[in-house]
């Protein structure tokens, strides 16, 4: 493990005597980066929650036309071996922010409508798949953040403040109750294991779960949210996105995370965390499960790059920088061509060993694929999909180029979760996987037409 402080460039006599054109670029400040205290509900945005990263407030109204797209007929759907002749597909979804529809660092109605489970349900012709939407009046939900200038070299954000759902303070904070039926049980910072064990009131998923389900506070009780789901839903197909949010949350523990933080279940019993998934699938239900993308493919981990400060060969142990207000100030003050000598605390640096711990391709993704094989699940290899998007080589079947950069069309302003277009791309990957595994014929979303129909602009 790296030492507490990492020097990106060793100080040498030649550096001290450098010319004016290469003056040392040493950044130090004593600023306290306060988190926005006006928010009773902790922000889902990894960086915009800091006041120093906000440039102001903005009022935003829904701009994408979901109903215009959703009202279109899909055509014939052949479910292949998903269900028997004459049987109906009844689908639920579990998981984290991707499945819940987190976008731009918030959970709000427009993001929920375009979440990939809702898009997949449309393509499957399922009219009874329900999302726990925020109300039409509280359409901005938890609130969210938009890039102040999407074309800027380094990001800052504006805070969306209008038509938000009222939050009651407490532990946990309380959001308005969703009164309808739901088929999507995913929550931000969530996974199916929290549907099994929901007794911790201080965990971030709780306010979102409590909107549409009743958390069971007695850990010794046989009751759980999963018990409620199984009692109230006769589902036979499940969308499972269980591990990505854990990966993102664990990355923020640097420099204190270990191999076990990411791969503890493999260390302990040689498999993925599966007890809740096993219970959800205990009647032989079919479905899909996602692999975990590598963090390097996210704009979140590319807002501030080592390569812009120094030649990577100068400090081969330093792999990635964790976004933070202090790091932002370093990049804003750094003068191209100057020598960079600022001392960085280890909390900002993901070194080569830590990066290897966090690589899901080494251990966890193979185990996800093994689990899928044993349980007759289709696999959406999100690791491979995000690698292609990151490399700039992803083009949809209808010829639409997908851009995974900060200035691109796939990721929203939180640098982690997709835009509406990105969710449609994920939905198509889900459909690819389902059709391949179960010999079904579910129509893909025509991305070019989707973009035109909903009025997406990026």
Predicted features along the sequence, with ranges:
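A short helix->loop->beta-strand "cap" motif at the edges of active sites that frequently abuts
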Residues: 282-286
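Histidine-centered active-site loop/cap adjacent to the catalytic His
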Residues: 31-32, 120, 360, 364, ...
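Catalytic nucleophile-elbow at a beta strand-turn-alpha helix junction centered on a G-D-S/GDSL motif
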Residues: 88-105
